[in-house]
Swiss-Prot record:
Binds 1 potassium ion per subunit. Homodimer. Heterotetramer of two MnmE and two MnmG subunits. Belongs to the TRAFAC class TrmE-Era-EngA-EngB-Septin-like GTPase superfamily. TrmE GTPase family. Residues 221-366 form the TrmE-type G domain. Its cofactor is K(+). GO terms for biological process: tRNA methylation; tRNA wobble uridine modification. The gene is mnmE. This is tRNA modification GTPase MnmE. Its EC number is 3.6.-.-. Keywords: Cytoplasm, GTP-binding, Hydrolase, Magnesium, Metal-binding, Nucleotide-binding, Potassium, tRNA processing. GO terms for cellular component: cytoplasm. Gene3D superfamilies: P-loop containing nucleotide triphosphate hydrolases, Probable tRNA modification gtpase trme, domain 1, tRNA modification GTPase MnmE domain 2. (6S)-5-formyl-5,6,7,8-tetrahydrofolate binds at residues 27, 84, 124, 442.
């Protein structure tokens, strides 16, 4: 990736979806954008107005006929001169157009996320908005889309900028007391008010971090693990939840030996359900490995569904784990006298109890996530920097025996950590990581 500020070349990339398609969009950004469209279109389109033109190579051969739009700097996505070619989405058409663009001097194919990185470099967005756009592109459920839109709309940026300004103002009061301690127009000992304000800010940030766990669940998904003895109906339940045959079903015990995972969309919340090897004593080395993996996945679960065949002898045993566990009686169509032992009774043969269980899973997911309406930290990077901010605030508040100069320095560091979240202070070392998450063309 080029260094920020050294964008002397013009970049281009296919910004629309997979080919072939009805329409393909090729985006261009950089100082030679005007030269590019004048060369290919032999015309100068009016800014922000679509023009229907023929696209030609440098030797005059027609490539396609389509629309071009021009967005002059600084009022464009990247802050540079930008253009979009809208052409037919045939593979040969797009490949020819990209080849022609690549032959123009000063033009090259864009790297992943480079358009967005240029937008950041030119002050069109901060890092949290860029991350929100990445999450919006990756969103697969309605809940993920809503969360990503909150971030991409700038809610995080506004909150963190406000907190940072409060720290800067508080530090200014302390430095004023240091510089003008003998002056009559400086209020007597404003520092006590400052420490109270910092304490309130610390509690706000702590509450904000706590809400991040729910956001992480929505962004990364909840994890439900199905466990039980061999032939308890685990694979049959997984197939029902998936709506297709994911797992092999057999009367032979020990058929499932590895982890099988499906992703569900329950009310806009991503939920990953994992089928595991049957828990039992075995001499099979392969099956033992599967059982070890099952127990490891259980330890990471948000919810465990412990299945037992209701038609056989009752021997309900639950592995000792921290996650919430539901006891599920299976094969309810075959009967069972001890049905009160289980939270739910299901039969994949008749469908009995399955919709009730599915509704319960959705209710569980919704209760775990709750309503996320305010700005929340959506990435571990945010949480790490927020914790570092709190640590410096605590040092400033609790440093009664320290000189005010040192406590003011703690406040400066705290505001710097907040600034690193939004990119207001130097974050060069993490930019490649953030923008590499985008596809080429974004």
């Amino acid at each position: 990736m080029s260094e920020i500020g050294s964008y002397h070349d013009t970049i281009f990339a296919l910004s629309s979806g997979r080919l072939p398609s009805g329409v393909a969009v090729i985006r261009i950004s950089g100082p030679k954008t005007r030269f590019v469209y004048e060369t290919i279109c032999q015309a100068i389109p009016e800014p922000r107005h679509a023009a229907l033109l023929t696209f030609r190579s440098r030797n005059g051969d027609a490539i396609d006929r389509g629309l071009i739009l021009f967005f002059p700097a600084p009022h464009s996505f990247t802050g540079e001169d930008c253009a979009e070619f809208h052409l037919h989405g045939g593979k040969a058409v797009v490949e020819k157009m990209l080849a022609v663009l690549g032959e123009l001097p000063g033009c090259r194919i864009a790297e992943a996320g480079e358009f967005t990185r240029r937008a950041f470099a030119n002050g069109k967005m901060d890092l949290t908005i860029a991350e929100g756009l990445a999450d919006l592109i990756a969103a697969e459920t309605e809940g993920q889309r809503r969360l990503a839109m909150q971030v991409a709309s700038g809610n995080q940026r506004k909150l963190y900028s406000e907190w940072r300004q409060r720290l800067i103002n508080a530090r200014a009061f302390i430095e004023a007391e240091l510089d003008f301690a003998d002056e009559s127009d400086v209020p007597g000992s404003v520092s006590m008010q400052v420490w109270q304000q910092l304490s309130a800010l610390k509690h706000e940030i702590e509450h904000h971090i706590a809400s991040g766990k729910r956001a992480a669940m929505l962004r990364d998904g909840l994890h439900v693990v199905i466990v039980g003895a061999p032939n308890a109906g685990k694979s049959s339940l997984l197939n029902f939840l998936a709506g297709r045959d994911v797992a092999i079903i057999s009367k032979e015990a020990g058929t499932t030996r590895d982890l099988l995972e499906v992703k569900l969309d329950l009310g806009g919340i991503p939920v990953y359900v994992t089928d595991t090897a049957g828990l039992r004593e075995t001499d099979s080395v392969v099956e033992k490995i599967g059982i070890e993996r099952a127990r490891a996945r259980m330890a990471e679960a948000d919810l465990v569904l412990s299945l037992e065949d209701m038609s056989g002898p009752v021997s309900v045993t639950v592995e000792k784990i921290e996650a919430e566990t539901w006891l599920i009686g299976t094969k309810a169509d075959l009967g069972g006298s001890a049905s009160g032992l289980w939270k739910y009774h299901i039969s994949t043969m008749t469908g009995s109890g399955l919709e009730q269980l599915l509704d319960a899973l959705q209710a569980f997911a919704e209760a775990k996530i709750g309503q996320i309406e305010d700005a929340v930290p959506t990435r571990q990077r945010h949480i790490n920097l927020l914790r570092a901010t709190i640590e410096e605030i605590e040092k400033a508040i609790e440093g009664d025996d320290l000189p005010l100069e040192l406590r003011a320095e703690n406040m400066r560091l705290a505001s710097q950590f907040l600034g690193r979240i939004t990119g207001d202070v130097d974050v060069e070392e993490i930019l490649d990581v953030i923008f590499s998450q985008f596809c080429i063309g974004k």
